[in-house]
């Protein structure tokens, strides 16, 4: 979302606080990979952002063959009720550059390892890539040449869910109801149309996963369907 959209969400969600920066300048310009969190339940212990590029600490840096500047925002949270700590990374991969997608996946995994260590980790975002893409395979450790250390890789909550997936299998529809309906009813290979993911590792148990395709006042609230999950930190 852009800053005005972040502000709208903030006004509509008074029980939530948020963190993040604009991807174009590291301040307010451009899209955010903002993280909203329930402030009565979670305490932010530390947070930051990095760019999906060869120079991840340089604000506004464009990576590889990407068409747009891309960013990841992360935070370390403490659950005020249980005392459990975990990290959440929210990202948005490029929609054009295949090399950028794969390199972004490698960078993201490296940053997660460096920043979060052995803490429980949740990764959310629009990855703009399908399950048979190199980027997805890197994220899940299935790519050729991937390191064998399983701690470096993530698990797709869609498959880890103890109670399966609720709702749609399409996460992007572009506001087009007919496309959504055709993809669901005609047996379209969902691996080619699911591009939004929740990944987990290090003691995260996924109870439920869902892709919600409901409308609000007769209209989809976004060109992507919300992807949600119920999780438990089990360690």
Describe the function of each predicted region:
Residues 18, 88, 121-123, 154:
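Hydrophobic/aromatic residues located in beta-strands of well-ordered beta-sheets
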Residues 5, 9, 101-104, 108, ...:
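Stable alpha-helical elements in mature extracytoplasmic
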Residues 2, 95, 129:
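Short, glycine/acidic-enriched loop or turn micro-motifs at the edges of active sites
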Residues 2, 29, 68, 98-102, ...:
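Solvent-exposed, acidic/flexible segments
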Residues 91-93, 126-127, 225:
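Active-site metal-binding loops of divalent metal-dependent hydrolases
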Residues 49-57, 93-94, 161-163, 211-216:
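Short, solvent-exposed aromatic-acidic interface loops
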Residues 1-89:
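Structured beta-strand-rich core segments of catalytic domains in phosphoester-bond hydrolases
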Residues 41, 99, 110-121, 129-235:
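Metal-dependent phosphoester-hydrolase catalytic domains
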């Amino acid at each position: 979302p852009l800053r005005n959209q972040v502000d709208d969400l903030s006004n509509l969600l008074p029980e939530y606080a948020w963190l993040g920066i604009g991807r174009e300048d590291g301040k307010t310009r451009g899209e955010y990979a903002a993280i909203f969190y329930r402030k009565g339940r979670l305490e932010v212990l530390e947070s930051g952002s990095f760019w999906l590029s060869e120079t991840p600490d340089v604000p506004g840096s464009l990576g590889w063959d990407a068409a747009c500047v891309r960013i990841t925002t992360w935070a370390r949270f403490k659950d005020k009720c249980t005392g459990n700590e975990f990290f959440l990374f929210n990202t948005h991969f490029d929609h054009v550059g295949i090399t950028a997608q794969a390199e972004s996946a490698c960078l993201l995994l490296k940053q997660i390892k460096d920043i979060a260590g052995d803490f429980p980790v949740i990764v959310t975002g629009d990855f703009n890539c399908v399950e048979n893409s190199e980027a997805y395979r890197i994220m899940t450790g299935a790519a050729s040449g991937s390191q064998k250390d399983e701690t470096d890789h993530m698990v797709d909550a869609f498959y880890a869910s103890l109670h399966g997936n609720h709702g749609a299998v399409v996460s992007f529809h572009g506001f087009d109801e007919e496309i959504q309906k055709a993809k669901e009813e005609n047996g379209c290979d969902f691996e080619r149309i699911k591009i939004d993911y929740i990944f987990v590792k290090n003691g995260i148990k996924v109870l439920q996963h869902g892709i919600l395709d409901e409308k609000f006042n007769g209209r989809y609230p976004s060109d992507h369907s919300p992807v949600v999950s119920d999780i438990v930190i089990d360690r």
